[in-house]
């Protein structure tokens, strides 16, 4: 037996041994050995690197009868009798605004993005949005097609 003094108090510390083996070795006999965990490897299919980035939006060309289509939708949702300045009708009612824009998106195949919805305050704003054509080309394609100086070339495959 060994004795220790901790702040004036004497303690007895026993060396814990069972049949001549230290405590750690005694208890380690009862521990189960952990089996090594085999990690299954999953083969990932790697997609080929694109030669050019995918296009963000589809092309849109406004139809010739856009104004008459929009006027018919406005008559359908806001009533058959329209004032002469029907393009200045306010779109404050969110249900009517949603119905109008949803039907136009289905009909024309071009959706008003979320970032522009707050700008659609009047029917004229909707008409102006749908009158703008959208090209299906990226800026790099436009640069490639334009007349570039001889020392500047755009090459997709490198």
From Swiss-Prot:
One GO location term (cellular component): mitochondrial large ribosomal subunit
Database matches in Pfam families: Ribosomal_L50
Top-rank taxon, per record: Eukaryota
Ranges annotated as spanning the membrane: none
InterPro entries given in the database record: Ribosomal_m50
Chief localization: mitochondrion
Subunit structure: Component of the mitochondrial ribosome large subunit (39S) which comprises a 16S rRNA and about 50 distinct proteins.
Name assigned to this protein: Large ribosomal subunit protein mL50
Gene behind the chain: MRPL50
């Amino acid at each position: 037996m060994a004795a220790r003094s901790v702040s004036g108090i004497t303690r007895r510390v026993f060396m814990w041994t069972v049949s001549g083996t230290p405590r750690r070795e005694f208890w380690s006999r009862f521990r189960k050995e952990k089996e090594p965990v085999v990690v299954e490897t999953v083969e990932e299919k790697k997609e080929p690197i694109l030669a050019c980035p995918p296009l963000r939006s589809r092309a849109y060309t406004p139809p010739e009868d856009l104004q008459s289509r929009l006027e018919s939708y406005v008559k359908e949702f806001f009533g058959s009798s329209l004032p002469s300045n029907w393009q200045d009708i306010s779109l404050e009612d969110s249900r009517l605004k949603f119905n109008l824009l949803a039907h136009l998106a289905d009909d024309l195949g071009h959706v008003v993005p979320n970032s522009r919805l707050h700008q659609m305050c009047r029917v004229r704003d909707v008409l102006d949005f749908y009158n703008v054509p959208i090209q299906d080309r990226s800026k790099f394609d436009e640069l490639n097609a334009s007349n570039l100086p001889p020392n500047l070339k755009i090459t997709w495959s490198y």
